[in-house]
Amino acid sequence: ASVNTKKEYDEVTAINKKIRSVLKNFKKNAYVGFTATPFANIFIDPMLAENSEDRDLYPSDFIISLVSPDNYFGPQKIFGPENAEESEYIRLLAEENTGEAKEDWQKYFPVKQKKDVTCHKVDDLPRTLKEAINLFIFNIYVRNHRGYASKHNSMLIHVSCLVDMHDAIKKQVTRYLLDLADNIRNYAGMKGTSEYLKYITPLENLFKEMLKNNWASSPEFEAPDFDKMLSELPNIISSITVGMSNTSEATIKYSSEHQTNMIAIGGNSLARGFTIENLSVSYFLRNTKMCDTLLQ
């Protein structure tokens, strides 16, 4: 927020201007800025103004790249090195051109969205989003059995900046969770039937696929068992809260007394500058030309 984003050098953004005015009150001062997305910062020319009092805040002296701590889960960990073929943490929703996956989500969440046209299309959820929700539910089970039953769990859904879209998605996610819990209660014990094949087998297939990809693998714990997990899923699903964060509603709140399992839906306010507790699954379809926004 302290970066002066005005195009003309003699124009200054509000926060940048106020920080400069504070520094002018002292004969000796130093301004140190920290950023996780150092894109615009490195192109600032601190000597652009003729008057030293009007010079920008940084980086007139130096820029230092801090060493990441061992427990930092950042872009290099998520995406891997540049020559990596794929990341174990990312499942692409679509390739560059065409494919089943792209058609899956684009029917509901097109890249270009207009409020009056798009919102009425959200009468269901794409298969990929349902799978992401299922994986989040699996994660809660695994964490509960690893001693984190009192810790929060979160999932992020960011597919639109339209408030009306957030509301439509929230309704469909809530409906999906209710239906999923009912289907597990009704059909989990009916192996070999068409109902089991329709409602339970997709969960089992996802579970097996994730195990093959080293999901929930740890030398300290046994691999989870699907049937044991299945019996606990209805209670886990009923514990999940679907919240939103946007200009009209802010219902993403975590309890200070017990575990909160949160599916957070939002747009710009949720994409950057918002702390989500123990985030384990993100369903992300953001389209932006700004490098820092994309990285955030």
Can you say where each PLM-predicted feature lies in the sequence?
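Generic recognition of flexible, low-complexity loop/linker segments
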Residues: K18-V22, K28-N29, N51-D54, V142-R146, ...
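Conserved P-loop NTPase catalytic core
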Residues: S2-V142, S154, A188-L197
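Subunit-assembly interface segments of extracellular/virion macromolecular structures
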Residues: A1, G33-F34, M262, G267-S269, ...
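A short beta-strand element within the Helicase C-terminal
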Residues: M262-I265, L270-N287
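Conserved C-terminal RecA-like helicase domain
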Residues: A1-D10, T128, V142-I263
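Secondary-structure transition/capping motifs at alpha-helix termini
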Residues: V22-N29, G147, D179-I184, I276, ...
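Flexible loop/turn segments at secondary-structure boundaries
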Residues: S2-N4, P38-F43, A49-E50, Y72-P75, ...
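C-terminal, active-site-flanking charged/polar segments
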Residues: R55-I64, T174-N183, S280-Q296
